[in-house]
Amino acid sequence: MKIDYYEALGVTRTADDKTLKAAFRKLAMQYHPDRNPDDPEAERKFKEIGEAYETLKDPQKRAAYDRFGHAAFENGGMGGGFGNGFGGAGGFADIFEDIFGEMMGGGRRRSNGGRERGADLRYNMEVTLEEAYAGKTAQIRVPTSITCDECSGSGAKPGSQPTTCTMCSGSGRVRAAQGFFSVERTCPGCNGRGQIIKDPCEKCHGQGRVTQERSLSVNIPTGIEDGTRIRLAGEGEAGLRGGPAGDLYIFLSVKPHEFFQRDGADLYCKVPISMTTAALGGQFEVSTLDGTQTRVKVPEGTQNGKQFRLKGKGMPVLRQSVTGDLYIQIDIETPQNLSKRQRELLEEFEKLSSQENSPKSAGFFSRMKEFFEGIGE
């Protein structure tokens, strides 16, 4: 019984090319013979989805199939130009390599003498808020793999050279028959390197790199925030057998500050003042990150939580000529451990107080009582 190509791929008859390709890719991953050895059913399904995609990916074949079904390709249908299955130049082998190549280790890629790019490295660094404000140049030591100086990264013992793998002729890939088509696989003779090192370097054991701690200078720009990432190109792990080095990524975090809290480019500082300063007015000085002392005037009658804005005294914005502000929040401290005389004076002050002195608290409780009595009626 002939299969329905759309059902085989699990798509509707209106599926576009992108949907067809995605469906084929997913099913090919699922039923590929390499993942299902000695499984005839998986092999059958794999052939079916390949046949279905081979037909539906071609606009002419798809139009013929939609109109005539499988009869379009039988007995010389459509002028005999399509044939049955995956015949013709390229065929399913090309489809498989283009769409599914990475599963087989890169499809049509060719080895570059076994050279491999080194891995990217991550380095976590903490900085103070002051350092984030002003920027700095930091020296760090990073344990990493560097190019072996004994063999200059070739992996071969000095005086010798790697030889080209005869199994893959230096490509690092070999073709293997898979039913009615062939696919590329990593060469088992050289593990994809394209070269064979018969006499490996004693220092790096044929890897072309050794582990060593390096000292690097890192420029920390002004205005960095938690999670800011700095990339040092080529400062990561050395490549294998002369391959390019990876990159080093510096991930920055800013330590909590004793006095300032940060919100983007703005800073916040809670300053305690006495009750009398809040009532009578006064002034105080705060230290800012630019190294200056800034005077803050407190008007009489200042309430708890009042904020004063110091423009331009916050954090610089990374890579911009913009600076945030510093907000001073007043925290009025209630007197404790009063002496007898202090208590007497406060009691006298309370007797002399009027509604004008405390407009918020005056009448608050009576209004609250009236409110809840009204609800109960």
UniProtKB/Swiss-Prot annotation:
Zn(2+) 1 binds at residues 148, 151, 201, 204. It comes from the Bacteria. GO terms for biological process: chaperone cofactor-dependent protein refolding; DNA replication; protein refolding; response to heat. Pfam families: DnaJ, DnaJ_C, DnaJ_CXXCXGXG. CDD domains: DnaJ, DnaJ_C, DnaJ_zf. Keywords: Chaperone, Cytoplasm, DNA replication, Metal-binding, Repeat, Stress response, Zinc, Zinc-finger. It is found in: Cytoplasm. Its cofactor is Zn(2+). Transmembrane segments: none annotated. Zn(2+) 2 binds at residues 165, 168, 187, 190. Residues 4-69 form the J domain. GO terms for molecular function: ATP binding; heat shock protein binding; unfolded protein binding; zinc ion binding. One of its GO terms (cellular component) is cytoplasm. PROSITE patterns: DNAJ_1, DNAJ_2, ZF_CR. InterPro entries: DnaJ (IPR012724), DnaJ_C (IPR002939), DnaJ_domain (IPR001623), DnaJ_domain_CS (IPR018253), HSP40/DnaJ_pept-bd (IPR008971), HSP_DnaJ_Cys-rich_dom (IPR001305), HSP_DnaJ_Cys-rich_dom_sf (IPR036410), J_dom_sf (IPR036869). CXXCXGXG motif repeats lie at residues 148-155, 165-172, 187-194, 201-208. A zinc finger (CR-type) spans 135-213. Binds 2 Zn(2+) ions per monomer. NCBIfam families: DnaJ_bact (TIGR02349), PRK10767.1 (NF008035). The J domain is necessary and sufficient to stimulate DnaK ATPase activity. Zinc center 1 plays an important role in the autonomous, DnaK-independent chaperone activity of DnaJ. Zinc center 2 is essential for interaction with DnaK and for DnaJ activity. Belongs to the DnaJ family. Participates actively in the response to hyperosmotic and heat shock by preventing the aggregation of stress-denatured proteins and by disaggregating proteins, also in an autonomous, DnaK-independent fashion. Unfolded proteins bind initially to DnaJ; upon interaction with the DnaJ-bound protein, DnaK hydrolyzes its bound ATP, resulting in the formation of a stable complex. GrpE releases ADP from DnaK; ATP binding to DnaK triggers the release of the substrate protein, thus completing the reaction cycle. Homodimer. This is Chaperone protein DnaJ. It comes from Brucella abortus (strain 2308). The lineage of its organism: Bacteria, Pseudomonadati, Pseudomonadota, Alphaproteobacteria, Hyphomicrobiales.
